[in-house]
């Protein structure tokens, strides 16, 4: 046990000196997850897995009411079943995913008969933001708006 204490102290010192990030060093909040309350878990899971193409990750509940997706290194999307109905949402409240090619993504949406639009609501057209980023908008099975863009920053 006495040999372990110096080893642990040495490890902590090396981490501090080398600048390896730790929770104590983080100065701001970090997004952990976003949760969406959905009407049909299977349909929503298939949408985010097969259309958006994000990977599922293990969830701790194992109760048939949750699906978790990894959306970034330390950020997740949680889909939770139990909504009594599908609700209309405003486009200003949306999730956004960046992809290598908006054109290829539009082709996928067309193949799956999922309508999309520009920010102004023009059907089957992308928007070109003032900074050159191309973007489209559509809704998931529960009426949540999703933006797809080609922002590479």
Annotate the PLM regions.
Residues 1-26:
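Bacterial Sec-dependent N-terminal signal peptides
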Residues 23-42, 93-95:
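N-terminal beta-strand motif that seeds the catalytic metal site of vicinal oxygen chelate
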Residues 35-76:
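Core segments of cupin and vicinal oxygen chelate
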Residues 40-42, 95-142:
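Vicinal oxygen chelate
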Residues 63, 91, 132-133:
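Exposed loop/turn and edge beta-strand positions of beta-sandwich/beta-sheet ligand-binding modules
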Residues 66-111:
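Mid-chain, structured segments of secreted extracytoplasmic proteins
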Residues 152-153:
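A short acidic/small-residue loop/turn micro-motif
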């Amino acid at each position: 046990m006495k040999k372990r204490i110096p080893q642990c102290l040495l490890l902590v010192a090396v981490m501090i000196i080398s600048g390896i990030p730790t929770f104590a060093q983080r100065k701001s909040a970090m997004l952990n997850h976003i949760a969406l309350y959905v009407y049909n878990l299977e349909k929503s899971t298939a949408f985010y897995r097969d259309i958006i193409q994000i990977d599922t990750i293990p969830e701790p509940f194992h109760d048939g009411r949750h699906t978790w997706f990894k959306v970034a290194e330390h950020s997740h999307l949680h889909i939770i079943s139990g909504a009594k109905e599908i609700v209309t949402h405003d486009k200003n409240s949306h999730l956004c995913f960046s992809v290598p090619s908006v054109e290829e993504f539009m082709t996928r949406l067309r193949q799956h008969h999922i309508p999309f639009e520009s920010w102004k609501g023009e059907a089957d057209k992308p928007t070109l933001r003032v900074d050159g980023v191309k973007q489209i908008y559509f809704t998931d099975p529960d009426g949540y708006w999703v933006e797809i863009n080609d922002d590479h920053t």
